[in-house]
């Protein structure tokens, strides 16, 4: 095929994850000869697509350079791991680390042309969804925690205990693992095309936009997107209430304040996380109604997976270090003294 790619279509797809766009990975005969899938004309220069792996690798390296150290710092300190405003961000760090490692595994299998078994594909699909769902739910919990502390301080003191944060984290992972897993495996069971494909692991975030995907597949991923935007609406409402309360009390107008910094940092991060779902939804609608061609569809999926999905995960660690001075001091204690001057805080 030279310098072009012809990705093999797969019946059941998942979001978010890496597209397998490798020229040396052979398509199965059934998929290659099946022109009804409408993907035979998908030819994108591999030399151009490989450039997307460069920013993805840099963002992954930036995340792995500090994120594990920050996570260990929080979990090793007994006082920090009992406070919700440290434990919930630690859960986001854990979820993002899981996603980064899965992303690297998928990228390696794609670049190396490895063929993963069907069981491995299913496990990776569920793990990717669970990690992303845990991140969104953890952000929602952080905003609700801040909302209770600002709007209802008396209820907050009576409600939040040392064990409440751990129960919230356990509930987040329970929902993150059960809800997407049930919907994904239900769609896999319904999708008859899965039985006709080989063992190649292809995980394009196209959400059933290919012709022939069953109705249940579309309903499955639409339900997941609805939960995502429901959490986003709840976060936006809480942010507005927090902003109104801070402005009324005069905290917002006191030059630089911790409340303003916290709200700004979380607004930027949540916007970046949610933007991937927006791009995903737009791609689904435009592709399904044939408003974009297959080449544009492929580029949207690749850019969303390789850049947009990785950017907020790389920024989160460093923004939290700038926000929490105590946490920054603990992390700096693990670094050589000559590197301390390179890190500063805005708090």
Curated annotation (Swiss-Prot):
Q: In which tissues is it expressed?
A: Expression restricted to nervous system and testis. Is also detected in several tumors types, most notably prostate cancer.
| Any Gene Ontology CC annotation | plasma membrane
Q: Which residues lie on this side of the membrane: Cytoplasmic?
A: 73-85, 152-165, 236-261, 323-347
The residues that carry sugar chains are 34
Molecular function terms from GO: G protein-coupled receptor activity; odorant binding; olfactory receptor activity
Identify the keywords attached in UniProt to this record, alphabetized: Cell membrane, G-protein coupled receptor, Glycoprotein, Membrane, Receptor, Transducer, Transmembrane, Transmembrane helix
Q: Name one Pfam family in it.
A: 7tm_1
Q: What is its main location?
A: membrane
Q: Gene3D superfamilies, per this entry? A: Rhodopsin 7-helix transmembrane proteins (1.20.1070.10)
Which chain regions cross the lipid bilayer?
52-72, 86-106, 131-151, 166-186, 215-235, 262-282, 300-322
CDD domains in alphabetical order: 7tm_classA_rhodopsin-like
Q: From which domain of life does this come?
A: Eukaryota
Q: Which GO terms describe its biological process?
A: detection of chemical stimulus involved in sensory perception of smell
Glycoprotein: is it a keyword of this entry? yes
InterPro entries named among the record's database cross-references: GPCR1_Superfamily_Member, GPCR_Rhodpsn, GPCR_Rhodpsn_7TM
- Can you say where in the cell this protein is located? Cell membrane
User: Which regions of this chain are Extracellular-facing, per the record's topological domains?
Assistant: 1-51, 107-130, 187-214, 283-299
What membrane topology term does the record carry? Multi-pass membrane protein
According to its UniProt entry, the function of this protein is described as: Orphan receptor.
Of which family is this protein a member? Belongs to the G-protein coupled receptor 1 family.
Question: What is this protein identified as?
Answer: Probable G-protein coupled receptor 148
């Amino acid at each position: 095929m030279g310098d072009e790619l012809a990705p093999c279509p797969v019946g059941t797809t998942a979001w978010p994850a890496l597209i397998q766009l490798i020229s040396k990975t052979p398509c199965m005969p059934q998929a290659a000869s099946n022109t009804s899938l409408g993907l035979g004309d998908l030819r994108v220069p591999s030399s151009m697509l490989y450039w997307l792996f460069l920013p993805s690798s840099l963002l992954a390296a930036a995340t792995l350079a500090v994120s594990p150290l920050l996570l260990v710092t929080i979990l090793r300190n007994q006082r920090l791991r009992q406070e919700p405003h440290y434990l919930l961000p630690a859960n986001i760090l854990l979820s993002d680390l899981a996603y980064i490692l899965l992303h690297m595994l998928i990228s390696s299998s794609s670049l190396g042309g490895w063929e993963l078994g069907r069981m491995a594909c299913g496990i990776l699909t569920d793990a990717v969804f669970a990690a992303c769902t845990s991140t969104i739910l953890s952000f929602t919990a952080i905003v609700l925690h801040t909302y209770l502390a600002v709007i209802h301080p008396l209820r907050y003191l009576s409600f939040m205990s040392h064990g409440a944060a751990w129960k919230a984290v356990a509930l987040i992972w329970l929902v993150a693992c059960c809800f997407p897993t049930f919907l994904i495996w239900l769609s896999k069971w319904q999708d008859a095309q899965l039985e006709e494909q080989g063992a190649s692991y292809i995980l394009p975030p196209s959400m059933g936009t290919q012709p022939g995907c069953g109705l249940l597949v579309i309903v499955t991923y639409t339900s997941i997107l609805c939960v995502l935007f429901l959490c986003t609406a709840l976060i936006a409402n809480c942010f507005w209430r927090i902003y109104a309360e801070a402005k009324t009390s005069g905290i917002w107008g006191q030059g630089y304040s911790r409340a303003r910094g916290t709200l700004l940092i979380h607004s930027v991060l949540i916007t970046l996380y949610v933007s991937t779902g927006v791009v995903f939804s737009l791609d689904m609608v435009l592709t399904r109604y044939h408003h974009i061609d297959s080449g544009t569809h492929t580029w949207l999926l690749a850019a969303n997976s390789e850049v947009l999905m990785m950017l907020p995960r790389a920024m989160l660690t460093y923004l939290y270090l700038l926000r929490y001075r105590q946490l920054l001091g603990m992390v700096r204690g693990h670094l050589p003294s000559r590197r301390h001057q390179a890190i500063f805080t805005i708090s």
